[in-house]
Amino acid sequence: MNTKPGVFLECEERTKRNLEALKRSLRTKLGDSFDTLIGDQACVYVTGSMGRLEMGVKSDLDAYTVRFDGSGEDSSSLEEAVRHANKEVGLPPLDSNGKYVKTVSASSLLDLLGSPRDDSEGVLTKRMLLVLESRVLLGQSAYDKLVGQVIDAYWQNDDLHPKGYQPFVLVNDIIRYWRIPNCQ
């Protein structure tokens, strides 16, 4: 028996339909280039209301593309496929002309962990969105690897505390992500 109120069920069902439609559109658009652009070295994932399965009728797509190989492979066709799928599914235009769809390296989500630039370059937000509220569109194996590496990065000091290591850096990042700025 489902105990969710009707409005939440509607949002969840709408989101699942949109996720499947986006996946189909992306696969079709990429066609023969899928293995080259995605394979097991890249992924496309969504966050925001789609990642939380709570899309409203006016919700937009918050998609990210990440590569592991750092090969310099031109990912513009992958980014264009995301834009095309967004339009084909009938979602609102991407925020900021789709700047978040721009492909980033997996290492960029890890290299700044704990540094002052983590916030200023928006990496903390990308990392927290990935861990807390993301769903994969394409590249399941790369997505799983990415999430695993991000989580593992928060346990990098566990060998220094063999009895009862607590991931305080992760807890701190979650707090920083959710903190409301102190406006004066």
Regions found by a protein language model. Name each.
Residues 23-74:
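Active-site nucleotide-donor binding segment shared across nucleotidyl transfer reactions
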Residues 3, 45-48, 136, 161:
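Generic detector of intrinsically disordered, low-complexity, polar/charged segments
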Residues 13, 17-37, 73-176:
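Conserved catalytic core of two-metal-ion nucleotidyltransferases
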Residues 1-7:
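Long, non-coiled-coil amphipathic alpha-helical linker/lever segments
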Residues 65, 177-184:
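Extended alpha-helical coiled-coil/bundle linker/stalk regions that scaffold oligomerization
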